Amino acid sequence: MLRGEKIALRARSEADVPVLHAELHEDVATRSRADSRPWRPIASGQGSPYAVAEPSDGAAVFSVERLSDGELAGEALLWNIDLHNRVAHIGISLRPSHRGCGLGTDVVAVLCRYAFAILGLHRLQIETLADNLAMQRAAMHSGFVVEGTLRHSAWVEAEFVDEVVLGLLATEWRMT
């Protein structure tokens, strides 16, 4: 288990799946903002994007637990991990009741520590919708810098929207 100030990142359990699925996948508006594929109904089970999966070199998937009460707060992951080039992408998704209280900032910080200090990665990247200011603030708190804008690169609820690309190198990272 990886601990921050407010959260812990732990392995996904079967008990997490229905909660994450109900609150993160079934919220069509939120899910369509977080996924590059169109939303479609999926039963909460093995087809769920939150199902427990075998460990892989290409992704590190965590459940986010709030330390104050042990409650499941959401999911966090390093995805598209490339061990040769030592790069990966960060993704987080918090349950609605756990947003806006600083957990995302702590999640990003713990993922950075895992990526740089444990995996020995060299670069992390985040792509987020341009209006997702909370994610941008959380990333910049850990040292990420805005590297550019991908204009009209995401199709979200009947319109094209911009994405912001943020990056962080191991040499720029400050361990907190």
Labelled PLM ranges:
Residues 1-27, 61, 65-176:
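Acyl-donor (CoA/ACP) binding surface of acyl/acetyltransferases
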Residues 21, 50-51:
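A generic alpha-helix structural signal
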Residues 28-50:
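Conserved GNAT-fold acetyl-CoA-binding loop/helix
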Residues 41-43, 54, 70, 144:
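Compositionally biased, low-complexity repeat tracts
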